[in-house]
């Protein structure tokens, strides 16, 4: 069963559906005939005079319970957004419970003393809106939006989830499971790995630098969630922002009514370790074997939220990496063709923020791209940008600002962010004017003060066997794995596990699966195994097919040696969104040849294959097809090197028995081993029966909501 290929195609389909829709619309527009004599301007029109940005006036107040309140009357749309922010973010969580704030935020809308999770969702949807809660480093926020005429209903629900959440035990378990799945996805995604490593390296043991782990998530109990809620979800010091088609008088009266009886002050934040003071630049290499690209994230601590340097730094960031017309993008992509994009940004939490420059580059140019990024940082520090470059950045930022405060939700977010950071009342209304007033001298002084390359944290996620040498030429390199554990250079070429295949478990049969996307049947997949002969050799032939709603069709045949289970042939064909895809691979010992033509988000990969692999390397599709032949047992773990023809790389795939599960699918109920396969483009969980006949009852992508469920088996 070619499950890896099926999952790859399913994931590409879910992600690409919107992209194909946009492409179709674009093509339809392009086919509209134009007049024969149509003339197109050769120069952009001159800029019109800048119109003043009219920020709506707002009213401040304080409720009897100590909630600070800001009301912004904005009557352009008949909607309203209400945000309640409380000092209850990650900074308030003990290190051994990292992730607790996110679970509490997730659970606030999952049940109260008078409403179930479904009732909360239905009531808010009935008001023409939505409700959500999330946490960041410093704050926990609950936001509800609705039609303005339904503000009372929305406010009552908001107050209920804040004041009367019950944290049902089943919901706690589900939230923890979702967080563990999210962690699995993070540990498989280079961008997320870079962000996790960067935060830890910059902030150290400070709460801003902590990453939740499997251990901290599993340690979180319902009692922990309830205790955190009771200690920190309190009115005194909270901020309520209401923006939309409302009157201040109505909002004040309603807020006092719905929050009546809410009392208390939150527990203070625990003492936190100091942020490390960096004295030199270090490169941290996060080894991801088989990666075809490298993710670079470089930066340093920068400013606190009330530093007036925010205005020149906003302009400097726009010049350096704030868009497709910025230096990093133009040089690394347009001039060098090293990446699809390179950008920069800086953060402003309640404490110390950071500057970050990032790019995802081709593996062979990793060191060159990093060197160029550092050169551009030095250039910005040592050479004040030209007047024309400054003017272009200012014009964009000043002209774009009104677009960021158009809707009630945008206004509420902007006002809340400013107030929570302790910024003055005129910060948002006058932000644009202060940007426009920045002088060239102020910009140069800020660049000289903040931008540096001699005290940086540089994180590179990529295949250490291919990029370590180049990185060493740029500076000191420390190697870690995906979880941040130290690695030695010798660890970059870990030896695969010797697998004692139980070939007798591979019995000829046919299987049918339904493909579920977000709980809805979207298509069908089939697979079959048969014994055959090729000359004097006995082989196993595994065929599979998949159809996803007519958007994707795929057929695969994998042939392996019946005695050794070594790969012999792979044939894959089909189409995705109208694009043909095919893969032909032939294995002769350690030598593989063939051709691939596979659509991807970066375009079509069309390439000949002619490469020599290490002894014992499997085809990744063979590995997934043969999982039922592993001698599965609690805690069992294997690592094999597998060739991925889609990308043309060898990746170490791991299969780990992570537990037991009872699985009910249309074909019946089965007692299964849960086997987590990682190391590919994304993690996959397989549910394999514990007793004969050994089969895959279900398999699922971790992250994207795609599940394959067994519906029938013959014989």
Predicted segment positions?
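N-terminal secretory signal peptides that target proteins for export/translocation
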Residues: 1-16
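Bacterial N-terminal signal peptides
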Residues: 19-32
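His/Glu-rich zincin catalytic helix
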Residues: 36-122, 143-146, 156-157, 226-331, ...
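M16 family metallopeptidases and their MPP-like homologs
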Residues: 70-72, 76-106, 115-162, 176-180, ...
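A common structural junction motif
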Residues: 160-167, 258-266, 375-384, 474-482, ...
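Contiguous hydrophobic, core-forming segments of folded domains
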Residues: 371, 375-379, 548-632
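Acidic, serine/threonine-rich low-complexity disordered tracts
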Residues: 498-589, 634-715
């Amino acid at each position: 069963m070619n499950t890896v290929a099926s999952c790859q195609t399913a994931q590409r389909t879910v992600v690409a559906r919107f992209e194909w829709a946009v492409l179709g619309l674009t093509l339809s527009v392009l086919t509209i005939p134009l007049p024969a004599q149509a003339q197109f301007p050769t120069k952009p029109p001159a800029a019109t005079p800048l119109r003043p940005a009219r920020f709506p006036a707002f009213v401040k107040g304080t409720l009897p319970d100590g909630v600070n309140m800001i009301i912004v009357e904005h009557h352009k749309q008949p909607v309203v957004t209400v945000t309640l922010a409380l000092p209850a973010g990650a900074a308030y969580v003990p290190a051994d419970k990292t992730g607790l704030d996110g679970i509490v935020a997730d659970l606030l809308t999952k049940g109260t003393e008078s409403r179930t999770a479904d009732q909360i969702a239905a009531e808010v949807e009935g008001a023409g809106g939505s409700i959500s809660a999330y946490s960041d480093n410093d704050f926990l926020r609950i936001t509800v939006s609705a039609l303005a005429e339904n503000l009372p209903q929305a406010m009552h629900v908001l107050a209920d989830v804040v004041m009367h959440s019950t944290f049902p035990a089943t919901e706690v378990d589900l939230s923890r499971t979702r967080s563990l799945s999210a962690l699995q996805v993070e540990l498989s995604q280079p961008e997320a790995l870079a962000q996790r490593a960067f935060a830890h390296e910059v902030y150290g043991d400070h709460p801003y630098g902590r990453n939740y782990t499997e251990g901290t998530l599993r340690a979180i109990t319902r009692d922990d969630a309830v205790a955190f809620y009771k200690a920190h979800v309190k009115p005194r010091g909270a901020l309520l922002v209401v923006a939309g088609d409302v009157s201040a008088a109505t909002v004040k009266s309603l807020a006092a009514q719905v929050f009546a009886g809410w009392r208390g002050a939150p527990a203070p934040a625990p003492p936190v370790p100091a942020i490390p003071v960096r004295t030199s630049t270090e490169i941290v290499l996060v080894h991801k074997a088989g990666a075809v690209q490298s993710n670079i994230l470089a930066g340093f601590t920068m400013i606190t939220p009330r530093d007036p340097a925010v205005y020149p730094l906003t302009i400097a960031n726009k010049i350096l990496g704030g868009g497709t017309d910025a230096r990093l993008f133009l040089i690394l992509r347009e001039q060098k063709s090293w990446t699809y994009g390179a950008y920069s940004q800086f953060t402003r939490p309640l404490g110390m923020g950071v500057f970050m420059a990032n790019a995802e580059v081709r593996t062979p140019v990793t060191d060159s791209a990093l060197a160029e990024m550092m050169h551009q940082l030095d250039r910005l520090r040592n050479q004040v940008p030209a007047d024309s470059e400054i003017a272009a950045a200012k014009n964009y930022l000043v002209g774009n600002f009104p677009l960021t405060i158009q809707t009630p939700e945008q206004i509420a977010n902007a006002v809340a962010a400013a107030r929570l950071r302790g910024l003055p009342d005129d910060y948002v209304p006058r932000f644009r004017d202060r940007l426009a007033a920045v002088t060239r001298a102020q910009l140069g002084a800020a660049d000289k003060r903040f931008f540096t390359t001699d005290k940086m944290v540089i994180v590179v996620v990529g295949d250490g066997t291919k990029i370590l040498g180049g990185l060493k030429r740029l500076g000191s390199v420390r190697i870690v794995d995906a979880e941040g554990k130290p690695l030695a250079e010798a660890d970059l070429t870990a030896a695969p596990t010797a697998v004692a295949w139980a070939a007798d478990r591979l019995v000829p049969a046919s299987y049918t699966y339904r493909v579920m996307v977000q709980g809805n049947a979207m298509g069908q997949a089939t697979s079959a195994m048969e014994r055959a002969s090729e000359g004097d050799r006995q082989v196993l032939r595994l065929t599979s097919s998949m159809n996803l709603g007519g958007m994707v069709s795929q057929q695969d045949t994998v042939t392996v040696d019946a005695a050794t289970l070594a790969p012999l042939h792979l044939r894959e064909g089909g189409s995705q969104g109208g694009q043909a895809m095919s893969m032909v691979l032939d294995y002769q010992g350690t030598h593989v040849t063939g051709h691939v033509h596979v659509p991807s988000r970066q375009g079509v990969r069309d390439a000949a294959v002619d490469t020599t692999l290490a002894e014992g390397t499997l085809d990744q599709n063979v590995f997934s097809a043969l999982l039922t032949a592993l001698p599965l047992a609690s805690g069992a773990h294997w690592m094999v090197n597998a060739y991925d023809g889609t990308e043309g790389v060898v990746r170490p795939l791991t299969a780990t028995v992570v537990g037991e599960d009872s699985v009910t699918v249309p074909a019946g109920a089965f007692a299964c081993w849960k086997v987590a396969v990682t190391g590919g483009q994304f993690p996959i969980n397989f549910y394999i029966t514990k007793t004969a006949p050994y089969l895959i009852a279900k398999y699922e992508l971790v992250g994207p909501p795609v599940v394959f469920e067994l519906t029938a088996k013959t014989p």
